[in-house]
Every structure is written in C-alpha cells, then in structure tokens.
Design a protein with these regions (language model features):
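Short, well-structured segments within or immediately adjacent to enzyme catalytic domains
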Residues: 1-213
Length: 213
C-alpha cells in the first residue's frame, strides 16, 4: 500500500476517475480504464467497486491476488482464477477487478475512497483505518440479527459480550478484526469503533454518535 502511494503522489488506490461513484465495475476484463469503469469521454464519471481499488495493487504494485484471502479466518473466499470465468488470454495485471463476483475472492474491506476525502499519506491522520477484515454488514455469511448500536455493553455475562461482538467482522469467531492503519501498523482490534476519535470503521457517520456510524 505504501509503495503504491509513493508511486502515485501519496494517494492510496482509487479505481475509476476522481468523480466515480461506488457501484459495480462495468467490465472487469476491459482493454482500458474507460471501458472498465464506464467513464465519460472526458474521463469523468463511471462507477467502481471497493475491491477494484484494492485490485490496483495487483496491477501496479505486484501484489498477488492470493494475498487478499484471509488464510486464518475466511474459509469461503477462494483465490481469484480468471480462467474459471473464461478468461485465459490475459495476465492478472491486465484485469481491473477480482472477476464478476469480487466478494468471493477478497476477504478485506477498504476505506470508502469514492467521496470527497480519499486517503493520502500527505494529509490524512496516521491513526486512520485503511483496510480491515470483511465488513459484517456487507457479508452475506455473517449474522447481525438483533444487534443494536446503542447497546455496546462490554461487561457482565457471556451474552453481553456476544452482543457487542456482533459489530465485529464475521471472521475470527467475531472476537475482533485485523486493522491496517495509515502509519502501516496492523492491530487486532476487539471492537469496531477503533478509528480516529473512536470512529466505527464499518459504518458511515451520520453526524450523531461516531461510534455508531
């Protein structure tokens, strides 16, 4: 991640254009960036998945797709193999995303880069969370039934502990998640509100309690 930022004016990976929205990748096997993300003729607009931004590390930083699988906790994600999707004439670096079903080939969540405040090593807080084990709210295999953000009791019996742990990633038995911070350190956090000023790393802040999103 740091190598990429050093090569790209301190900016972290961000697929598409500066005005692309979070959505789907138009054509993950396209021959050029415009077709891959559905950009306009002037190079603006389009949409991209979060995983396509991570895939830029495959294209430009020599990271292998297998590096995006959590070997210790994610038993469902499989190493990306383009041949399984009928693509046999291109190398990994020729593509733009982890196939048509990227969630099956990437275990990690990445900060929301499609917005007014993308991460930069030059201007962002070193305590900012950059990447983390998969978001439980976007993971079809993770049960968040009954979880309430205003019930974060971490004391008492086993059920209380299991309750607040529902805000954690589904990997690692809901005990916490590995978080990569901007200053390059990785820490296993046992709660999801571990960002700057206790920001919840899995949710979008609505202006109220930053721990809830």
């Amino acid at each position: 991640m740091s190598i990429y930022a050093n090569d790209w004016d301190n900016c972290f990976p961000r697929a598409g254009s500066l005005t692309s929205k979070w959505g789907t990748t138009a054509n993950w096997q396209a021959d050029n960036r415009s077709n891959a993300f559905g950009l306009k003729s002037d190079g603006t607009g389009g949409s991209a998945t979060i995983s396509s931004s991570l895939y830029l590390l495959v294209k430009y930083a020599e990271v292998l797709p297998k590096s995006f699988i959590c070997q210790s906790g994610d038993l469902r994600a499989k190493k990306f193999n383009p041949a399984k999707y009928g693509v046999r004439d291109k190398e990994f670096e020729d593509l733009w995303d982890f196939g048509p079903e990227p969630a099956k080939h990437c275990s990690y969540s990445y900060h929301m880069c499609y917005g007014p405040y993308p991460l930069s090593t030059a201007s962002s807080d070193p305590g900012q969370a950059v990447a983390v084990d998969r978001n439980p709210w976007l993971d079809p295999y993770t049960d968040t039934t009954g979880f309430k953000w205003n019930d974060q009791t971490k004391t008492g019996g086993r059920e209380n502990i299991k309750g607040y742990q529902k805000g954690n990633s589904g990997l690692h038995k809901r005990e916490g998640q590995n978080v990569l911070f901007l200053d390059n350190h990785v820490y296993f956090e046992n709660q999801s509100f571990c960002g700057v000023k206790n920001d919840n790393i899995y949710t979008y802040w609505n202006g109220s309690d930053i721990r809830q999103g």
